[in-house]
Amino acid sequence: MDFWLYKQAQQNGHHIAITDGQESYTYQNLYCEASLLAKRLKAYQQSRVGLYIDNSIQSIILIHACWLANIEIAMINTRLTPNEMTNQMKSIDVQLIFCTLPLELRGFQIVSLDDIEFAGRDITTNSLLDNTMGIQYETSNETVVPKESPSNILNTSFNLDDIASIMFTSGTTGPQKAVPQTFRNHYASAIGCKESLGFDRDTNWLSVLPIYHISGLSVLLRAVIEGFTVRIVDKFNAEQILTMIKNERITHISLVPQTLNWLMQQGLHEPYNLQKILLGGAKLSATMIETALQYNLPIYNSFGMTETCSQFLTATPEMLHARPDTVGMPSANVDVKIKNPNKEGHGELMIKGANVMNVYLYPTDLTGTFENGYFNTGDIAEIDHEGYVMIYDRRKDLIISGGENIYPYQIETVAKQFPGISDAVCVGHPDDTWGQVPKLYFVSESDISKAQLIAYLSQHLAKYKVPKHFEKVDTLPYTSTGKLQRNKLYRG
């Protein structure tokens, strides 16, 4: 298959691919820049690299350049601690990290995009096609594409089953998991999203979710497959985002529930040009749904995973009006079912489709992930008689705070290493702003300084993972077989 960006440069070259409000790149511009950079990246002789990047045009150029150079990209969550980043990258044998943000990480070759020069200049200069720096182009049907000469040609096609990106996820026990996402996975996800949500070449999608998350990267993939425009934004600011919605003909936007709430508080009381507001990352409250629908906002709730390359369940406004607790119906190109449903129809959600990863890169010895071709999500769900899917527990003990997944096992492991703590468990605590925040229960025979404990945890965990609530207890609830009864702490 032709590289999607190459195809768009040929067929849709003058259409705006990406804009940050200051600079805009057509698909021709984007392909030109990515191709030039790709030739330089090849000199590093890496088949897999880490990316430590922000939401910027230069980051998007870097992503496409890596793919044009046949380099797999391992996305790094910029909120992680150096130790967490190191463990992730070493587990998948990454030796070199390209970055658009300052980074110091021992044990790796760190290369800033600002330091990569090609054809006598820096990538950060906007290179238009009338200044091609020695690369020859030919014109056909008013579209300018590189001539295919041995001295400058890059691969313009790829194998759908090659790994495009790698992201890390985790269960609540055990090590972090490396998820390989192939071009086929991304393509199937984009097609499923187009059918269930809807977008076309005239779409103008505001993307403020981090590119290192699948929710952010998937917008870029949908754009380059379909040929629409992405309005990239690095930081969420409700006032600024609302101004963009009003003034820049934004048709689509991806948000987590809390950011939608902030936008409504800021004054998003009508849709303007918005056709779709795609929500995910945390549960929607019935109150928020009611308020949004009263404003005629086109909200679409969704459910997806890193392993499924973003959403595979989508609820339309009509579905949410009928049943506010639903995450909708599956995309047409996936199949879902409930494993071992109880008398209420609740059981583990299983999914099968081309959007689903094949196997974890790390650890390599995981079992029980697939059953007869179906991926076991580990989420407790129900499918009603109309086909609506309800998620009741997202991996049960997984904490979702402001769209970020927080894994209790990591917090508990660090807490148990603090002097004086003999046992600890972390659960989600309700929070009006973030949905949930971590709460740590711990057992200790001595007095523990909360300030010292927080300082210790902050040394080993990303800031958003540090518990916001603490409670000292005499014992933790275990069954006779030694299984921790987290549900008693949720109620407690």
From Swiss-Prot:
One of its GO terms (cellular component) is membrane. It comes from the Bacteria. InterPro entries: AMP-bd_C (IPR025110), AMP-bd_C_sf (IPR045851), AMP-dep_synth/lig_dom (IPR000873), ANL_N_sf (IPR042099), ATP-dep_AMP-bd_enzyme (IPR050237), MenE (IPR010192). Keywords: ATP-binding, Ligase, Menaquinone biosynthesis, Nucleotide-binding. SUPFAM superfamilies: Acetyl-CoA synthetase-like. It is an enzyme of class 6 (ligase). Its EC number is 6.2.1.26. It catalyses: 2-succinylbenzoate + ATP + CoA = 2-succinylbenzoyl-CoA + AMP + diphosphate. It holds the Pfam family AMP-binding_C. GO terms for biological process: menaquinone biosynthetic process. Pathway: Quinol/quinone metabolism; 1,4-dihydroxy-2-naphthoate biosynthesis; 1,4-dihydroxy-2-naphthoate from chorismate: step 5/7; Quinol/quinone metabolism; menaquinone biosynthesis. One of its GO terms (molecular function) is long-chain fatty acid-CoA ligase activity. HAMAP family: MenE. NCBIfam families: menE. Belongs to the ATP-dependent AMP-binding enzyme family. MenE subfamily. Converts 2-succinylbenzoate (OSB) to 2-succinylbenzoyl-CoA (OSB-CoA). This is 2-succinylbenzoate--CoA ligase. It comes from Staphylococcus aureus (strain NCTC 8325 / PS 47). The lineage of its organism: Bacteria, Bacillati, Bacillota, Bacilli, Bacillales. The gene is menE.
